Amino acid sequence: MEIGLGVFSGECLPSEGKTHTQVLADSLDQMRLAEAVGLDAIWITEHHFLSSGYVGSVLPYAAAAAQATSRIRIGVSVALAPLHDPVRLAEDAAFVDVLSGGRHDLGIALGYRDVEYAGFQTSRAERVGRLEELVAVLRQAWGNGPLHHEGRYFRRVGMEVFPKPAQAGGPPLLMGGHAPAALARAARLGDAFIMDGGTDSSVFGSAGHNRDLYGRVAGTLAMYREALAAQGRPTDDVRFYLTLGGFLHDDGPDAAWEALQEAYLYTRRVYGDWYGIPEETWGRWYPHLLTPEEHAQRRSEVALGAPEDLLPVMRRLRAIVGDGLHVMFRCKYPGIEDGVTRRSIELLGEVRRALG
């Protein structure tokens, strides 16, 4: 199995007392550290129109990551596919792949925030069709010869994208989502599926409790394999990506939660708003406002501790999925002091080495 480090959102909070330039420079240093300690990938994500500076320019950020590193894979999880022009995305992703020497993985999904669709003058009702046509254009653009795509949303005929990606056929296309339709789409069009293991996930609902991670992974994997079989695709040795939030600390789970909780609850408030959870619910997600029971619920959403605490979690997940599992472990959160995050990354490297 593999472990990647996520997510690099490029956010800069006032509490950090730094410029955005400094925060981004720190993030590139953290990517170098992830490579040095033996992690398999770093993951960059996309959203728009947030005062925190959440990164919208996801491929330029990936290009900077490619130049800052030499071995680790450079992943995007995820680009909001319906908001992108397919030829522009094909060119940018191919360029990152060439720049990195064939280390790029491109994750895509539909997106869901109305403000982002409005900002790009795109109808949310068209998002599935736009994503599917975008995939068709990407596949053509990364092959040989000129494009010939005449669809409902895009007409791209006669031009050819250069340079071609370093990886034959282009970067692996990973597809994320929550609904059964997303699994079916990934099996039909993608190279792998990205499952949201819990952090920032709508599966929490208003209760916020991470319900049966292992059962959900097993169930989602089974549905993905069924969808692959329906497409006549292999179901053994499946590549399966799982996002999982948490934090590592030398002193164990309590210390890890103490380091993480302010930043994590900030992130949960943001996503609670995005997912349409009532403000009277997520508006209370501050450490000083939560009841002891609510604290326990929030804490249950993430994997916490020293390496010896995380290893059983990773081994159990590997036993369910197999060696094709890639865990995108999120211990990179806005607002946590750089040195504290760096130590968490170092400890995550210990977990990766222990897994072999």
Label each PLM-derived region with a short phrase:
Residues 1-356:
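Active-site-adjacent structural elements that line small-molecule/cofactor binding pockets in enzymes
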